[in-house]
Amino acid sequence: MGNIVVITGASSGFGALTARAVADAGDTVYAGMRHTTGRNAPQVKAAADYSAAHGVDLRAIELDVGSQDSVDAAIGRITAEHGRVDVLVHNAGHMVVGPAEAFTPEQLAELYDVNVLSTQRVNRAVLPGMRARRAGLVVWVSSSSVKGGTPPYLAPYFAAKAGMDALAVSYAGELARWGVETSIVVPGSFTSGTSHFAHAGRPADHTAEAAYEEHYAGLMDQVAEKLAALAPEGADASLVSDEIARIVALPRGERPYRVHIDPADDGSAEVSDVADRVRRAFLDRVGLADLLTVTP
């Protein structure tokens, strides 16, 4: 019997690729997205066409991670049809580019909502069922920016992803005794194959943005060019989706706590190794080493 898998933000990029990769492995996949009867209607059709052409079970579903009502309705429908959700992939996110000062506090709050609070909405809908069954997997799509090299003009996005990663780390320990596994997937700076940069938001304070542009002329273009140049040939976004599919397919108890897919090698893996080692040592010191592995 295959897994019932929910993927947020699955209209494009890592989400859409992951939905197809996991469905190809034989699982039933719900590709969550907004505006399924509007702007994302072509993506709904694309998912249905892929499902029919490849003989897999891939279904688009209306799931707006910014709305608890939408999340509850989607998870309620899936649970009514299958009785459970086995795997949840937190992929939904949004990026902004520009000088940090030029973003309003409200813009930072909106970004935090999409990248962090959205995971809490979905968790509150999905985790009660996983806890009741003492089984499940939560995959968090983080970012190498959390612990790796951080170029300028991406500060609000980096801060939000750091918040998401911190939440994932805490959830890992809190869910372990419930038998629910956590895997944190850390992509590097994939500048192609995703819609992050193409759909990135801009600062609302155009005066401040213009001042920075005058003083640091062309800096954002330089950052984009350098990030693209760091990635070796063949560094396709499917590396991330294929790794998520591999993790989902692993037997319970063998799924990794954290994995890096960073062809540019920005140092995130090295720093994460230290942080994760400190986490393990600390939990052992305070007598909570059992939280490092799921309870059968």
Labelled PLM ranges:
Residues 38, 61-73, 105:
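The beta1-alpha1 cofactor-binding region of Rossmann-like NAD(H)/NADP(H)-dependent oxidoreductases
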Residues 139-163, 169, 173-176, 188-203:
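Catalytic loop of short-chain dehydrogenase/reductase
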Residues 173-255:
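SDR active-site lid
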